Regions:
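Terminal, non-globular segments
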Residues: 1-168
Length: 168
């Protein structure tokens, strides 16, 4: 229970941030930060694959319900949850702990976040557009929203992992 409580709170906080703050930002049509990916990105390194996929499914369905989307969030989040173990094996060889800048190193953690967020955003915005007609516009949305999302997820990760023991 001591391991799950921080992640339940992270789930709730990322959903609330996404729904009440980031979904209401109307700065540009190209800027749509999707920070709820932080939940899947910050799950412990030794999370069993079934739990990882179930967590991704729960987050995706919750965000689809909250945003009124028809499965786009679920598909993108499940893909991120599926790819995450292979990505971590590629970037980081040790077992256990929480993925954070202090454990993985700043550069590796930043690369990890960039790959996860760009993968999520590529699937999300491609499915949202459902057309090749606005390919350049979709690519710009992926890059701009991805960069802003990575910055906010970095901040969330710093706040979330600051209070956790190293091994959690």
């Amino acid at each position: 229970m001591h391991r799950t409580l921080p992640y339940i709170s992270l789930f709730v906080v990322t959903v609330l941030l996404q729904v009440f703050l980031f979904d209401n930002l109307s700065i540009s049509i190209y800027l749509n930060p999707l920070v709820y990916v932080a939940f899947v990105a910050l799950l412990p390194l030794d999370t069993p694959p079934v739990v990882l996929l179930a967590s991704g499914l729960a987050m995706g369905v919750t965000m689809d319900f909250a945003m009124g989307a028809a499965g786009v969030n679920t598909i993108a989040t499940l893909l991120v949850a599926f790819v995450r173990p292979a990505l971590l094996r590629t970037l980081y060889t040790r077992e256990g702990g929480v993925p954070c800048a202090g454990r993985l190193g700043r550069r590796v953690f930043l690369n990890y976040l960039i790959v996860l967020v760009l993968l999520h955003h590529a699937v999300f915005f491609s499915l949202e557009a459902l057309s090749w007609m606005h390919l350049v516009r979709t690519l710009v949305r992926i890059v701009v929203s991805g960069a802003v999302s990575v910055a906010f997820i970095w901040i969330i990760a710093r706040i979330f992992t600051a209070k956790l023991p190293v091994r959690v």
